[in-house]
From Swiss-Prot:
Protein name: 3,4-dihydroxy-2-butanone 4-phosphate synthase
Record-marked site positions (Essential for catalytic activity): H136, E174
Pfam families: DHBP_synthase
Reaction(s) catalysed (UniProt annotation): D-ribulose 5-phosphate = (2S)-2-hydroxy-3-oxobutyl phosphate + formate + H(+)
Function according to Swiss-Prot or TrEMBL: Catalyzes the conversion of D-ribulose 5-phosphate to formate and 3,4-dihydroxy-2-butanone 4-phosphate.
PANTHER family linked to this entry: 3,4-DIHYDROXY-2-BUTANONE 4-PHOSPHATE SYNTHASE, GTP CYCLOHYDROLASE II-RELATED
Length: 217
């Protein structure tokens, strides 16, 4: 990742700390991966606190594929089958079947309906019957071990919201340009600045976690 572009957001460790503070303050975070991987930026929010306004922003400026990152334990609790048995996607992204809240939604498409679905899925006592399948929210199962196991946006989302003190569940969506192309680092950074989001890279988060876990051991 081009460090010059990111320098205004601090050092790699500072960027992670700023991202955690942003999440605690109810703001979003722009998570960038490597140019050699997807080379994309994802807007992320804690599933517990994401507002209808933030969901609307995500739908308006994102790919439209709004994803709910969850753990394997949560997937089992909700009895969500993986979307396919044999995942042949380029990066092995862990899509489950799509979901809709069983109650409190109309068509499931609106920002308010998608927030209702997210909240239903992450509720402490959530049951499989609380969700209909298919729907307009795309759960993603994170790999155990987070970014130290797989350097994906799914794992980064779970790691960040957990480090910030939230349940291990977060919403992500890829940022797109107005012409429908994928936003790259310069566009992602400009968007984050305009919308008061912190910016962090998956590489930053890997280094942060490795350093903290070395210290802990």
């Amino acid at each position: 990742m081009n460090q010059t572009l990111l320098s205004s957001f601090g050092t790699p460790f500072e960027r992670v700390e700023h991202a955690l503070s942003a999440l605690r303050e109810g703001r979003g975070v722009m998570v960038l991966d490597d140019e050699d991987r997807e080379n994309e930026g994802d807007m992320i929010f804690p599933a517990e606190t994401m507002t209808v306004e933030q969901m609307a922003l995500t739908i308006r400026h994102g790919s439209g594929i709004v994803c709910l990152c969850i753990t394997e334990d949560r997937r089992k609790q909700l009895d969500l089958p993986m979307m396919v048995e044999n995942n042949t996607s380029a990066y092995g992204t862990g899509f489950t079947v799509t979901i809709e809240a069983a109650k409190g939604v109309t068509t499931g498409v609106s920002a308010a309906d998608r927030v209702t679905t997210v909240r239903a899925a992450i509720a402490d006592g959530a049951k499989p019957a609380d969700l209909h399948r298919p729907g307009h929210v795309f759960p993603l199962r994170a790999q155990p071990g987070g970014v130290l196991t797989r350097g994906g946006h799914t794992e980064a989302t779970i790691d960040l919201v957990t480090l910030a003190g939230f349940k291990p569940a977060g919403v992500l969506c890829e940022l797109t340009n107005d012409d429908g192309t994928m936003a790259r680092a310069p566009e992602c950074i400009a968007f984050a600045g305009k919308h008061n989001m912190a910016v962090v890279t998956i590489e930053d988060l890997v280094a942060y976690r490795q350093a903290h876990e070395r210290k802990a051991s």
